[in-house]
UniProtKB/Swiss-Prot annotation:
It catalyses: guanosine 3',5'-bis(diphosphate) + H2O = GDP + diphosphate + H(+). The gene is spoT. It comes from Borreliella burgdorferi (strain ATCC 35210 / DSM 4680 / CIP 102532 / B31). The lineage of its organism: Bacteria, Pseudomonadati, Spirochaetota, Spirochaetia, Spirochaetales. Belongs to the RelA/SpoT family. Residues 62-161 form the HD domain. This is Guanosine-3',5'-bis(diphosphate) 3'-pyrophosphohydrolase. Pathway: Purine metabolism; ppGpp biosynthesis; ppGpp from GDP: step 1/1. It comes from the Bacteria. One of its GO terms (biological process) is guanosine tetraphosphate biosynthetic process.
Length: 667
């Protein structure tokens, strides 16, 4: 099976003779059946004939590319038919060969693999948006029928990324972005971390060349010094393992470049302040030994509370299993992540679905074995009537990076990046979502709409008086949460708005509507007489803050204020520091009892509050009510005054507001 250092070596090969020799040697070592070897070498001859005289942008003979793609597949120990398809994956598109000839030389199964890869055109050869989304939907369709197709495509993408520097800079950036946003998440969802890691780093290299070089040089210059700090502890663990009679392999690994870059973006911009650039991995034979090793590790190094993750008891969606713990190295107070798993778990961690072919002759991997594939199938069924797909929907439902949070009982919950406590609540149970009042994140009170982060412990507090709010639709990320909230709104409070299709307008599939809805704000009907800063925690400008509605006032606290715990049933409200006043365009949608006199009333309050009216549209609902959609321009302070005035008008039943950039309306 291919190791990480081998991938690093192989992606640098650009000599045809060297590529051919390594490929032949790998085939001889991997495929023991004579018929399989002869079939692969026959495909190599055919590929060399068909691609003769063709060259890549780098000036290399084109045949190097399919040889390298198939070399990756052979190193992954995929079946011989997949390796043949890798050699011939471009012949239908780039040569004059007919499909019938492939069937005659090989069989229908190999043709199906080649045809499947051919249909997945690279995204940079397409126009953006809808065509791009349809291309990805084809990829997903192929994936659900035969997972080998996407593994071949990932190998194809890996080698193409190695020759990206020969393309114009704008094409490099576009292809690298597509790789990072589409192919990397797919590799991650399929659990093929060895491919995911190199696709990430190659994309990073082209998108952020200065940062890439800085990190590479830093790791190279400090490698020996960093590894020395772990050596003493590593020896102590090895000694304890020998005493316990446990056979295990301990390796010190360096975090890959892009993961370090992400930490720099979220924690600190200074590379010298990123301490956990190294990790330790311990591979053992049996599952029960993982927990014994964990106990030994915690004897040698002090564990960090709350940083133990048991993915053995609760595997990730892509079948990943491992124990993760973070410990503190006493020599320099450095934090180190340690992963503990069995050999089988390690194969699945590195090679994901491809691991199913290792040591399992003639055993077919079924698409149903992976929940990610099942999710794709379900998405395709639900979208069966769509002739076109939205990239926003695809990324939101299928490709987003996931986060992993915990219930108070320690159960792992996987959520799309950007999810909040409402998403979490609906995953646990619909009733918990419908009645969610507030959350505790790592023991601290938090708003249920605040985005969650990896490894947080989430506890939901409910109330029978609490109910879903239409504003929740603006912040949730999971389809289940959106569906359940809409279902509740349809049955309960917002019937007038739902009946008049306003909710559908605001949360519809149209891209521009979604863009507007992302800026939708709601206002409480509670009359607030006073807003005050809590004198004890005394938050300052720029700090994370939260508001507590107490009687007729809002008390603003620092999010870490211990005083928050004293409220039995706090009514949380999201608050933020006021930005410098700027003029924005605001769509104000009003549901009216009657239309009479509304024009003069609105004109009067706009004039009094320095608000410029851009347009006004009024419609009769046909049920005694009216709807007006007003577009105005002003700063946030004046708009707030207007909203307050509108709430006092008994003719106005409900108010919705959407904010947009003024530049879209200025001539």
């Amino acid at each position: 099976m291919i190791q990480a250092y081998e991938i690093a070596h192989l992606i640098k090969i650009n000599d045809l003779e060297k590529a051919r020799n390594i490929f032949k040697k790998t085939v001889e070592n991997t495929y023991k059946d004579e018929f399989e070897r002869k079939s692969i070498f026959k495909a190599l001859e055919i590929a060399e004939q068909l691609h003769y005289g063709q060259y890549r942008e780098s000036g290399e003979p084109y045949i190097i590319h399919p040889i390298m793609v198939s070399l990756f597949l052979a190193k992954f120990q995929l079946d011989f038919k997949a390796t043949i398809a890798g050699l011939l994956h471009d012949v239908l598109e780039d040569t004059n060969v007919e499909k019938e000839e492939i069937v005659k030389e090989f069989d229908e199964e190999i043709l199906s693999l080649i045809d499947g890869v051919t249909k997945i055109h690279d995204l940079h050869n397409k126009t953006r948006s809808i065509k791009e989304a349809n291309t990805i939907s084809k990829m997903f369709f192929a994936m659900t029928h035969d997972i080998r197709i996407i593994i071949i495509k990932l190998a194809d993408k890996l080698h193409n990324m190695t020759t990206l520097s020969y393309l114009p800079k704008n094409r490099q950036d576009r292809i690298a972005k597509d790789c990072l946003s589409t192919y990397v998440p797919i590799a991650e969802r399929l659990g093929i971390s060895s491919l995911k890691t190199y696709l990430e780093d190659l994309s990073f290299k082209h998108l952020y060349p200065k940062d890439y070089k800085e990190i590479k040089n830093f790791l190279s210059e400090t490698k020996i010094e960093r590894e020395k700090k772990l050596y003493k502890g590593k020896l102590s663990i090895e000694k304890e393992l020998q005493k316990s009679g446990i056979e295990a392999e301990i390796t010190v690994r360096s975090k890959h470049f892009y993961s370090i870059f992400r930490k720099m973006q979220t924690r600190t911009n200074k590379l010298t302040q990123i301490f956990d650039t190294l990790g330790i991995r311990i591979i053992c034979k049996k599952q029960k030994e993982c927990y014994e090793i964990l106990e030994i590790v915690h004897r040698v190094w002090k564990p960090i509370p709350g940083r133990l993750k048991d993915y053995i008891a609760s595997p990730k969606e892509n079948k990943y299993q491992s124990l993760h713990t973070t410990v503190r190295i006493p020599e320099d107070n450095q934090l180190i992540e340690i992963q503990i798993r069995t050999e089988e778990m390690d194969r699945i961690a590195n090679y994901g679905v491809a691991a199913h072919w290792i040591y399992k002759e003639q055993i077919e991997l079924k698409a149903d074995d992976l929940s990610f594939i099942n999710r794709i199938k379900k998405w395709q069924q639900e979208s069966a009537n769509k002739s076109q797909y939205s990239m926003n929907d695809i990324h939101k439902e299928l490709l987003n990076t996931f986060i992993y949070v915990y219930t108070p009982e320690g159960e792992v919950v996987e959520l799309p990046f950007g999810s909040n406590s409402i998403d979490f609540a609906y995953i646990i149970h619909t009733d918990i979502g419908d009645q969610a009042l507030y959350a505790k994140i790592n023991g601290k009170i938090s708003s249920i709409t605040k985005p969650l982060k990896n490894e947080q412990i989430v506890e939901i507090f409910t109330s029978k008086d609490s109910k879903p709010d239409v504003i929740w639709l603006n912040s949730v990320r999971t389809k289940k949460a959106r569906s359940k909230i809409r279902s509740w709104l349809n049955k309960n409070d917002n019937t007038i708005f739902v009946d008049n299709n306003i909710i559908a307008y605001l949360v519809g599939a149209n891209k521009e509507q979604r863009k507007l809805f992302s800026l939708f704000k709601s206002y409480t009907k509670t009359k607030i007489k006073r807003i005050a800063i809590d004198p004890e925690c005394s938050p300052t400008t720029g700090e994370d803050i939260i508001g507590i509605i107490h009687k007729d006032e809002i008390i603003v606290h620092n999010e870490n204020c211990q005083k928050l715990k004293s409220y039995k049933k706090p009514q949380l409200i999201e608050v933020e520091w006021e930005a410098t006043p700027t003029r924005k365009v605001h769509h104000i949608i009003l549901l009216l009892k009657e239309l009479k006199g509304i024009f003069s009333y609105l004109e009067n309050i706009f004039t009094l509050n320095d608000v410029r009216l851009i347009s006004e549209k009024i419609e009769d609902c046909g049920n005694g009510h009216g709807i007006t959609n007003i577009i105005v321009s002003s700063n946030a302070k004046n708009i707030t005054k207007i909203i307050s005035a509108l709430k006092e008008n008994p003719n106005i039943l409900q108010i919705m507001q959407i904010e947009e950039d003024i530049k879209n309306y200025d001539n």
